[in-house]
């Protein structure tokens, strides 16, 4: 809160999960940075303090997440390292979910790869609306590559 968004926005925009956007689309990234810098400093501080800091870890919500059966699409950039493990956790926990990793992409996948992002979302929506989005087959929920009943893969 001590820094204004005019200062912090530039730092945030150059974070390790956003440089991919800058490398792919310098002009689009510059607009992104400008918009971040225009955010309310108080509003941004309140979001970090009131939401990011207070909410429990998603790992602590595993029991509640296991109850989710609504269609869920998890999108993640493969270079968004802080979110990769969480995305895999969500995929393994929510039986109605699918995970798509966007290659060479950071945290801003909708901005970095808008066509691929929109295509994945459109396909997801069509599958849900047509009744073709089903729960994951429980036989596939193992780390074994040989048999669903063979937990050691032997």
Give, region by region, the residue ranges found by the protein language model.
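Conserved alpha/beta-hydrolase "acid-adjacent" motif
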Residues: 81-86
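Catalytic active-site module of serine/aspartate enzymes centered on a nucleophile-bearing elbow/loop
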Residues: 97-154
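Short beta-strand/loop motif that positions the catalytic acidic residue
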Residues: 68, 74-76
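Conserved Class I S-adenosyl-L-methionine
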Residues: 42-44, 68, 106, 141
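Active-site phosphate/pyrophosphate- and oxyanion-stabilizing loops and adjacent acidic/basic residues
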Residues: 62, 88-89, 115
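Conserved alpha/beta-hydrolase catalytic His-Asp/Glu region
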Residues: 2-65
């Amino acid at each position: 809160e001590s820094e204004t968004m005019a200062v912090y926005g530039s730092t945030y925009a150059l974070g390790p999960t956003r440089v991919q956007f800058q490398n792919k689309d310098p002009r689009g990234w510059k607009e992104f940075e400008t918009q971040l810098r225009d955010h309310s400093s108080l509003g941004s501080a309140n979001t970090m303090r009131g939401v990011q800091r207070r909410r429990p870890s998603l790992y602590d919500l595993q029991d509640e997440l296991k109850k989710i059966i609504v269609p869920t699409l998890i999108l993640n950039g493969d270079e968004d390292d802080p979110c990769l493990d969480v995305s895999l956790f969500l995929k393994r926990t929510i039986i109605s979910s699918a995970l798509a990793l966007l290659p060479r992409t950071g945290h801003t996948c909708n901005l970095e790869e808008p066509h691929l992002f929109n295509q994945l979302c459109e396909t997801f929506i069509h599958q849900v609306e047509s009744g073709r989005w089903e729960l994951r087959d429980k036989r596939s929920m193992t780390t074994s590559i040989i048999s669903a009943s063979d937990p050691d893969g032997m």
